[in-house]
């Protein structure tokens, strides 16, 4: 995987699919945008619940695991990009087994901003299909997307209009967020009621979906928490937070987070 990553890094490519179908094969695309450092069961739960609740009826869904490597010239910490890609490919096989009504691809992009990711996906992955794209993220990411300090002196409503008019955002409420779970679950309805205008247009609330986690035990699972447990020797507890394939990979490669 190191060679594959180096080839991408040295190329002029903006996006590349490394595993799975090279182009969209379904009417609904779910993009799991994460650091995959490592992939875990909370990622799976987000995908599973989103597909269950929002996939188009009687159709298959296409899942894209997308890793942004915009800082590829800097040594990533605490796991290298090739290592993350190996785990993403293992996770893709796990998803294909657990979500048989979906197809799964693994991709790289140089872009970190969602408006840029969305543009390149439409150009090179969706390729003119009238597909609905949903981005699966953490609530903290949604909060950053709509934080006006990242857009000053421009307005969020101007910068993000094209993205929000054609995309959906999905996440699960978390227990370790700066907002209570209740506030997270109300976030979209608060936008619809105009509580964030003029910064966030009220109509965008219909395109944001914050769900209650069906498995409370996974509510606080995060990649950083897993890395800390691994460093502290709390290996057994990780069995409840990781797919078996990722757990085995980490046990056999304990130094990747050093």
UniProtKB/Swiss-Prot annotation:
Gene Ontology biological process terms in this record: ERAD pathway; invasive growth in response to glucose limitation; NAD biosynthetic process; pseudohyphal growth
Positions with a binding annotation for NAD(+): 35-36, 138, 140, 174
MF annotations from Gene Ontology: ATP binding; ATP hydrolysis activity; nicotinamide-nucleotide adenylyltransferase activity
Disulphide bonds in the chain: none
Ligand binding (ATP): 43, 224-227
Activity's dependence on pH: Optimum pH is 10.
GO cellular component, one term: nucleus
Catalyzed reactions per annotation: beta-nicotinamide D-ribonucleotide + ATP + H(+) = diphosphate + NAD(+)
Enzyme nomenclature, EC number: 2.7.7.1
Pathway(s) served: Cofactor biosynthesis; NAD(+) biosynthesis; NAD(+) from nicotinamide D-ribonucleotide: step 1/1
Disruption phenotype: Lowers cellular NAD(+) levels and decreases the efficiency of nicotinamide riboside (NR) utilization, resistance to oxidative stress, and NR-induced life span extension. Highly sensitive to heat shock and higher sensitivity to ER stress agents than wild-type cells.
Induction details: Expression is slightly induced in late log phase.
Keywords tagged on the record: ATP-binding, Cytoplasm, NAD, Nucleotide-binding, Nucleotidyltransferase, Nucleus, Pyridine nucleotide biosynthesis, Transferase
Similarity field: Belongs to the eukaryotic NMN adenylyltransferase family. POF1 subfamily.
Miscellaneous notes: Present with 830 molecules/cell in log phase SD medium.
Function per UniProt: Catalyzes the formation of NAD(+) from nicotinamide mononucleotide (NMN) and ATP. Involved in the salvage pathway for NAD(+) biosynthesis via NMN. Involved in the filamentation pathway. Suppresses the filamentation defect of a KSS1 deletion.
Subunit relationships: Interacts with KSS1. Interacts with UBC7.
Official protein name in the record: Nicotinamide mononucleotide adenylyltransferase
Upper classification of the organism: Eukaryota, Fungi, Dikarya, Ascomycota, Saccharomycotina
Gene it is expressed from: POF1
């Amino acid at each position: 995987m190191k060679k594959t990553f180096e080839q991408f890094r040295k190329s002029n490519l903006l996006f590349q699919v490394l595993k799975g179908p090279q182009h969209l094969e379904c009417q609904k695309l779910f993009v799991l945008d994460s650091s995959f450092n490592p992939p875990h069961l909370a990622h799976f739960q987000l995908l599973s619940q989103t597909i269950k609740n929002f996939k188009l009826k009687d159709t298959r869904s296409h899942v894209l695991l997308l890793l942004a490597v915009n800082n590829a010239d800097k040594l990533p910490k605490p796991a290298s990009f090739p290592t993350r890609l190996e785990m993403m490919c293992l996770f893709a096989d796990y998803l294909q087994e657990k979500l048989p009504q979906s197809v799964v691809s693994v991709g790289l992009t140089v872009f970190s901003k969602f408006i840029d990711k969305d543009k390149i996906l439409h150009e090179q992955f969706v390729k003119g299909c009238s597909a609905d794209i949903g981005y699966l993220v953490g609530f903290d990411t949604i909060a950053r997307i709509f934080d006006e300090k990242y857009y000053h002196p421009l307005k969020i409503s101007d910068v993000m209009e094209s993205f929000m008019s054609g995309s959906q955002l999905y996440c699960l409420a978390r227990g370790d967020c700066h907002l209570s779970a209740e506030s997270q679950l109300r976030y979209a309805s608060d936008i619809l009621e105009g509580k964030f205008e003029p910064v966030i247009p009220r109509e965008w609330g219909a395109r944001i979906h914050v769900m209650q986690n069906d498995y409370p035990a996974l509510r606080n699972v995060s990649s950083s928490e897993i890395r800390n447990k691994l460093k502290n020797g709390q290996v057994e507890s990780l069995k409840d937070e990781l797919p078996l394939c990722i757990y085995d990979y980490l046990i056999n490669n304990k130094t990747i987070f050093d």
